[in-house]
């Protein structure tokens, strides 16, 4: 997934299908494996470990969408890092993909020029475009869909305490996402 992402660096024509494929192969697979192995080590049966793998894939994908949004709509205090680093390095993020799909070729071309000579002062211009096309809200809707998939996957987890703890992670990520873009 990381290699695929590096191959698409600076590609403003990247579509959502390819973007999500990268997420599944990158963060999704990492979370999926961790959850699957954790379930196996805890004595889960094959059905339960498969469900935990599905949960991890969905949670990891949701987390990556959140991280993409945090980089554009968060605060430096909340992010613990400078904002706009993904766009500065040419990484494709869901809000930017949505912007390019909806805004048309003029804004996409202007964005391409901005990225080539990126400076943090341009983040407010980009945020204006992202806001105009409601890309945060659309990204959050996709994140919530992934979190719903994660919760659905937990139906096969027998231990209610473990299931509740994993569901709590989805609620926490949802709350963090809901706080983005709020001044």
Task: Describe the predicted segments one by one.
Residues 1-183:
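All-alpha prenyltransferase/terpene-synthase fold signal
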